[in-house]
């Protein structure tokens, strides 16, 4: 092993410096650079040289998929777990990450061996939770340990079919002198666990904590090393949890799986669209929008509230929608449709805790604002989507036919869409519009 060297590493972003700095030049945070001792190289040397084969021969060794025991999660991952796949799952403390992984471990352990490595809880604590969840499986091995070298030795000995590491911030390597959870330790642990999983074809779930800003704690390289990144979201005092696929080398991103927290653990919600629009109120400011980020559209409720401004400067607040995009939409409404909100507070919310980034939501947000402003309901059997341009034009968006088919499946009979899409769906009335003023005239 090479001689250790000293570096000052930012604990927020992983930036390295040869000397201490008060402010990190990369992320701008203060007093985050900590002195760490690390080996000269983190390069991973293969025990055997890799094969050089034609791409067609590699395809013959195509990835076999293993189920997680949850159909909706399998679908979100692209069909299940791939051998050697390393999945990082991140979320707030207490949100239910360990509960979900314990349930997955139990379902995979039917006929296979699963190793659950816990750096946060004792074996007794995990056993108590397992009992509460009704888990009693001899193939589920629990190993409370924080030493990486001991964990790797146990993996070589037990040869599990699935590894769960809870969590990466609690594990340390003897190769480094820094404490567990430091940037260097997190990087080293992830590298070596990933190396083992790829070599032995063992899929793994690695739990990662998040920062107060909501991003994954640790260096960004952590997200690059793993194959898949899952974000586990939801309010701690709410029953529902959402797993979002942020990155996936073996499937599409943007997929979601919805779960309901019960006293017996997490239960999957097979129809996310039904969940997100189940409590929709027929009131001004409420619009249904068919959202698509992955392969399957999901119906979401977009809500807007327009009220007289309480202060000299009107407020613009959003939850789940880009505030800059809202500012653009309000400006277009004022110039092109004479809908003035300059002396009013405007609030926009995407119900259910979802975040929408695609411009296809523009028209839905605009119509929700107009609905609240005019205090007139949007007809309840309408779905709305389309991008709003600066001249008020309604621009085409992708997956228009899939969005409409999902809406029809849930009983929606009318749709306000961009005129340029030229889509017809049997059993649905399509209202194509080319300008935002046309859209307002159709609905109100």
Curated annotation (Swiss-Prot):
Its EC number is 3.6.4.-. Transmembrane segments: none annotated. InterPro entries: AAA+_ATPase (IPR003593), DNA_repair_RadA (IPR004504), P-loop_NTPase (IPR027417), RecA_ATP-bd (IPR020588), Ribosomal_Su5_D2-typ_SF (IPR020568), Ribsml_uS5_D2-typ_fold_subgr (IPR014721), Rubredoxin_2 (IPR041166). Coiled coil: none annotated. ATP binds at residues 91-98. Belongs to the RecA family. RadA subfamily. HAMAP family: RadA_bact. Has a putative N-terminal zinc-finger, a middle region with homology to RecA with ATPase motifs including the RadA KNRFG motif, while the C-terminus is homologous to Lon protease. NCBIfam families: sms. This is DNA repair protein RadA. It comes from Aquifex aeolicus (strain VF5).
